[in-house]
Design a protein with these regions (language model features):
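N-terminal glycine-/serine-/threonine-rich beta1-alpha1-beta2 phosphate-ribose binding loop
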Residues: 2-6, 15-133
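Rossmann-fold NAD(P)-binding glycine/threonine-rich loop
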Residues: 122-130, 143-168
């Protein structure tokens, strides 16, 4: 089992001197542009700032922040060393223009350039094929590219044929090494039989806490107050976010899956799904009786309720609430843990498991940072 404790995933899993040990002694410069300075983007900017002296000293790597794009404005650097280290109030912002931003980061001097999209915006994801074809590397925790329309995903992969790299580890389970683990298994000739996982920290928390002592609606309200859910809890309860993550893994494994192909059973009935958010919150109690019945049925079988995503060797995918044996690994996770199990030819009797915190800006940003460093490892020093 690969287990990542919170304090572990906040740091890069690549040793500071890994690039130096591999023989790279010439200084390399990577121009970086960040789109979406929200919770994850801001955490990433701080991690980049804090790591820059160590990377320059131990790995001969300089990360040059060339700009930041917010929802309506963008900032472009002015080659000032201090301003280059972080974005802030001293800089001049201008109207948002993604094409101009990408062109600025890429420059015209043959530099290595990388765009990081932390926006969760479908319009931004639509630019990826063009950016990659132009030679810009792209790293993102944005699930809309990997789980969106299949033709766009295929265009993204085709655009990488020119040498640009596209990495998206943080789209599945934040900073946990899920996508890379699957990629490594397949690249070394293993055969994937099945994927099982709990991909939602919110739903894991609700299932772990739902023991009959409180109505399910009270737990949803508590999770909402704690910030565990999206502003509209139905975004979590629907299971759609989990389905997106499963589609991403399926495509990584070679199956041309779309969201419509996932057998998705959410926890919100159609009558409540059609309401406004405020009306839904007022009628949240209507979930109590069906969820209590599901809990009673699970206990009658000697099992527990867990929200599970699964993919079989034929590409069939499902996301639903399931009754699992009390001895099952998914029955013994920490409150908000994500866990993914890969059943393969090599890991058949005892699946390979990846488990740990699957949400939060710090761990998600660390997953993005790890992808950046993996790309940096492959770059040649340029004069």
């Amino acid at each position: 089992m690969i287990t990542c404790a919170p304090e572990q995933v906040q740091h890069s899993p690549l040793p500071p001197s890994s690039m130096t040990r591999m023989g790279t002694t010439r200084r390399r410069v990577l121009a970086v542009g960040v789109i979406g300075p929200g919770r994850v983007g801001s955490a990433l900017l701080e991690q980049l700032r804090a790591a820059q002296p160590r990377l320059a000293r131990d790995s001969a790597l300089e990360l040059k922040l060339c700009g930041v794009v917010a929802s309506k404005r963008m900032w472009l650097d002015c080659d000032d060393a201090e301003l280059n280290a972080r974005h802030g109030g001293a800089q001049i912002w201008r109207p948002n223009d993604l094409d101009a931003f990408a062109g600025h980061v890429r420059g015209n001097d043959g530099r290595h350039a990388l765009l990081i999209d932390c926006s969760a915006n479908d319009e931004v994801a639509a630019h990826y094929p063009r950016w990659l074809a132009a030679g810009l590397h792209v790293v993102t925790p944005n699930k809309l590219a990997g789980s969106g329309p299949l033709p766009r995903w295929q265009a993204i992969r085709a655009a990488c044929a020119g040498g640009a790299r596209f990495r998206y580890e943080a789209t599945v389970c934040a900073g946990l090494p899920v996508v890379q683990t699957l990629r490594d298994l397949l690249d070394t000739g293993d055969e994937l039989f099945a994927v099982h996982g709990m991909f939602s920290g919110t739903l894991a928390w609700l299932c772990n806490r739902h023991d009959g002592r409180q109505p399910f609606s009270a737990l949803v309200r508590e999770a909402h107050a704690l910030g565990y859910t999206e502003p509209d809890p139905r975004d979590d309860l629907s299971g759609l976010d989990v389905a997106r993550k499963l589609v991403i893994l399926a495509r990584e494994a070679g199956w041309p899956l779309s969201l419509e192909d996932v057998d998705l059973e959410g926890l919100v009935p159609p009558a409540l799904a059609a309401l406004s958010r405020d009306d839904f919150m007022q009628r949240l109690d209507e979930l109590d009786a069906p969820m209590a019945a599901k809990l009673a049925a699970a206990r009658a079988e000697g099992g527990v309720l867990r929200h599970v995503a699964q993919l079989d060797r034929h590409g069939r995918a499902s996301v639903r609430l399931q009754v699992l044996p009390a001895a099952h690994a998914f029955a013994h996770t920490r409150l908000t843990d994500n866990i993914v199990q890969f059943s393969t030819r090599r890991y058949c009797d005892n699946p390979l498991s990846v488990q740990g915190p699957g949400a939060g800006p710090e761990v998600t940003a660390a997953g993005v940072f790890t992808d950046l460093l993996r790309i940096a490892e492959s770059l040649e020093a340029r004069a």
